[in-house]
């Protein structure tokens, strides 16, 4: 199994990307990793090249680049070359912490979309209070969605939760403004009806306030609503940890209490760190494409590689294709 990685994408590239990739190559004996990027910048951080190769690419798609134009014009960029490795069959999956829009464009134009999937969906796995987490899609690949798209998202999320996360019968929830069957706009009402007709374990509408309670294993939404919910969760978590830090450093007594609570607080922070689940999978493409967070460190890249490896090993893409054929 070979996993291609854009070594130049992300805030901490290439150092953290290379460190995470090297750790994964050392940990998983059944994978090879291809790092794509400026070889002169990659090599200083690569201590052990066992099962790791480098493809030199002298262009980088920047965060400020217009996604589609960048993919079309920067043919020798690390991201485009990475996607080409997958398209040509030399890599089984790919990972980038770079420009999200450009990665989606490279996924669509280079890797290609699964026949029968109308639109891809960006799907991170987010933490829940019970420690199990849930798959959330779409969080921004497409701002709008038709009811049929939401039904496809549910199918892809179901396959991922079952094949990779080991959930025998994943609970599917539809993000809405209330839990009653007739809540929402025409899109969510129609999507609700379509999901009820499937063989999926559809539990109905779920509200944003219940997501971290573990109300569902897979939650589907249009990209606009999903992205707003995701950013709200991220912002709330950051604000709470910041407030907690201020409180626990406000006095000598508070600092003593913080010292006593440090192991518990560290465990809480780790539990709510969704980089432990890997990156956001771009579902609907012909191979696993993983979007790692732009601020990814070596640990996040390691888990993104683990995630890509599990998607390939469990044939998530093949299973999605088979399910589409079965239900068409």
From Swiss-Prot:
One of its GO terms (molecular function) is phosphate:acyl-[acyl carrier protein] acyltransferase activity. One of its GO terms (cellular component) is cytoplasm. It catalyses: a fatty acyl-[ACP] + phosphate = an acyl phosphate + holo-[ACP]. Its EC number is 2.3.1.274. The keyword Cytoplasm applies. GO terms for biological process: fatty acid biosynthetic process; phospholipid biosynthetic process. It is found in: Cytoplasm. Keywords: Cytoplasm, Lipid biosynthesis, Lipid metabolism, Phospholipid biosynthesis, Phospholipid metabolism, Transferase. Catalyzes the reversible formation of acyl-phosphate (acyl-PO(4)) from acyl-[acyl-carrier-protein] (acyl-ACP). This enzyme utilizes acyl-ACP as fatty acyl donor, but not acyl-CoA. Homodimer. Probably interacts with PlsY. Its main location: cytoplasm. Pathway: Lipid metabolism; phospholipid metabolism. Belongs to the PlsX family. Disulfide bonds: none annotated. The gene is plsX. This is Phosphate acyltransferase. The keyword Lipid metabolism applies. InterPro entries: FA_synthesis (IPR003664), Phospholipid_synth_PlsX-like (IPR012281). Pfam families: FA_synthesis (PF02504). It comes from the Bacteria.
């Amino acid at each position: 199994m070979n996993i291609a990685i854009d070594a130049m994408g992300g805030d901490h590239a290439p150092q953290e990307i290379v460190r995470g990739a090297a750790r994964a190559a050392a940990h998983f004996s059944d994978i090879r990793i291809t790092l794509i990027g400026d070889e002169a910048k990659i090599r200083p951080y690569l201590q052990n090249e066992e099962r790791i190769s480098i493809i030199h690419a002298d262009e980088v798609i920047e965060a400020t680049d217009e996604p589609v134009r960048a993919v079309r014009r920067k043919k020798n960029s690390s991201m485009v070359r990475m996607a080409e490795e997958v398209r040509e069959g030399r890599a089984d999956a790919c990972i980038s912490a770079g420009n999200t829009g450009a990665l989606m464009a490279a996924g669509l134009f280079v890797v290609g979309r699964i026949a029968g999937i109308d639109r891809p969906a960006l799907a991170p796995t987010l933490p829940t209070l019970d420690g199990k987490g849930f798959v959330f899609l779409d969080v921004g690949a497409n701002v709008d969605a038709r009811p049929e798209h939401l039904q496809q998202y549910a199918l892809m999320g179901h396959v991922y939760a079952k094949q990779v996360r080991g959930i025998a019968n994943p609970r599917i929830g539809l993000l809405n403004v209330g839990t009653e069957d007739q809540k929402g706009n025409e899109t969510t009402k129609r999507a609700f009806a379509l999901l009820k007709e499937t063989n999926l374990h559809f539990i109905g509408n779920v509200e944003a306030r219940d997501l971290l309670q573990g109300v569902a294993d897979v939650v589907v939404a249009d990209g606009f609503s999903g992205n707003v919910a995701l950013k709200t969760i991220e912002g709330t978590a950051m604000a709470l940890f910041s407030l907690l830090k201020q409180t626990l450093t406000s006095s000598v007594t508070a600092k003593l209490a913080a010292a006593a609570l440090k192991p518990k607080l560290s465990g809480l922070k780790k539990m709510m760190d969704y980089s432990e689940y890997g990156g956001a999978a771009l579902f609907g493409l012909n191979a696993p494409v993983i979007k790692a967070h732009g601020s990814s460190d070596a640990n996040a890249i390691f888990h993104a590689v683990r995630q890509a490896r599990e998607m390939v090993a469990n044939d998530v893409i093949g299973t999605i294709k088979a399910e589409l054929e079965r239900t068409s």
